[in-house]
């Protein structure tokens, strides 16, 4: 059991680092689990990869609790109004995922949750990040404050989030890319991605957990500990990564992540080719 818990810690670190950076946590977990794989059933592993996101979500809620809490003591009437408006934008941005991503999730997972499609998605969106950043160089963003983001923009960002239904896309990558295309600053894009992740990832993790049990699966005590340890690790690592990204985007663009995605995608393609041959 100790070895399984050590693996859970390692996978929790991978989740915490890659969930909020636009690099695809799914792609990383699949690559890492080729070498560091939990000795558990396939059904458990599929559920594990999603449910440990709860730790990452709780990190967002911890860091931004005062900003996201409309009942926070000391907030003015205007502050409370802005908080409710922010939540309204988040809810509106969730609508496309509810209407499109949820019904199609199982189909995309069955047909695209493999190394080659994930590698291609990594490369395609890596190129997109580099292209968008080069295109926007010298152009001032139109939206530099979340309070000034329109509901229409929030809805369109939600449409971009639907693209993350393709494994390897990266939920944060799709929403950040969409927000920048729609004229937001990098800071606004990152912040809204964090907030949008709360209901999206809570809902997705909840659906995966419910489906796991409805399919007749159960959890033994070892699996409970594995989920708990990985989620707590993802939470602690996410606290650091979220703060890093919010500071990073104030001085840098996302080009470096574009190159990283291309390199990782190429590595996955080479690895898939080698395993196919041998």
Swiss-Prot record:
Membrane topology: Multi-pass membrane protein
A Gene Ontology molecular function term of the record: undecaprenyl-diphosphatase activity
Coiled coil residues, start to end: none
Protein EC: 3.6.1.27
Gene Ontology, cellular component aspect: plasma membrane
Main subcellular localisation: membrane
Compartment(s) where it occurs, according to its Swiss-Prot or TrEMBL record: Cell membrane
Protein keywords: Antibiotic resistance, Cell membrane, Cell shape, Cell wall biogenesis/degradation, Hydrolase, Membrane, Peptidoglycan synthesis, Transmembrane, Transmembrane helix
Matches recorded under InterPro entries: UppP (IPR003824)
Transmembrane annotation, as ranges: 44-64, 84-104, 112-132, 187-207, 224-244, 254-274
HAMAP family xrefs: Undec_diphosphatase
Record-stated family: Belongs to the UppP family.
Anything else known: Bacitracin is thought to be involved in the inhibition of peptidoglycan synthesis by sequestering undecaprenyl diphosphate, thereby reducing the pool of lipid carrier available.
Functional description taken from the UniProt entry: Catalyzes the dephosphorylation of undecaprenyl diphosphate (UPP). Confers resistance to bacitracin.
Name under which the protein is recorded: Undecaprenyl-diphosphatase
Organism: Streptococcus suis (strain 05ZYH33)
């Amino acid at each position: 059991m100790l070895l399984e818990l050590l693996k859970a810690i390692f996978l929790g670190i991978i989740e915490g680092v890659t969930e909020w950076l636009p690099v695809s946590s799914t792609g990383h977990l699949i690559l890492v689990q080729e070498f560091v794989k939990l000795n558990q059933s396939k059904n458990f592993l599929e559920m594990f990869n999603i449910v440990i996101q709860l730790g990452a979500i709780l990190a967002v809620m911890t860091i931004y609790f005062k900003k996201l809490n409309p009942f926070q003591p000391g907030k003015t009437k205007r502050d409370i109004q802005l908080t409710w408006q922010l939540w309204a934008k988040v809810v509106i941005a969730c609508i496309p995922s509810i209407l499109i991503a949820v019904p199609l999730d199982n189909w995309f997972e069955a047909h695209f949750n493999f190394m080659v499609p994930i590698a291609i998605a990594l490369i395609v969106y890596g190129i997109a990040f580099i292209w968008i950043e080069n295109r926007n160089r010298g152009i001032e963003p139109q939206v530099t404050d979340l309070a000034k983001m329109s509901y229409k923009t929030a809805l369109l960002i939600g449409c971009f989030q639907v693209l993350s239904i393709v494994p390897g896309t990266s939920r944060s990558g799709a929403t950040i890319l969409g927000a920048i295309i729609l004229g937001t600053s990098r800071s606004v894009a990152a912040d809204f991605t964090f907030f949008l992740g709360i209901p999206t990832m809570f809902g997705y993790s909840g659906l995966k957990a419910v489906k796991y049990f409805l399919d007749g699966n159960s959890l033994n005590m070892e699996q409970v500990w594995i989920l708990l340890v990985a989620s707590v690790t993802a939470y602690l690592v996410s606290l650091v990564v979220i703060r890093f990204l919010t500071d990073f985007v104030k001085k840098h663009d996302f080009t470096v992540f574009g190159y990283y995605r291309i390199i990782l995608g190429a590595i996955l393609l080479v690895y898939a080719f080698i395993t196919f041959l041998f």
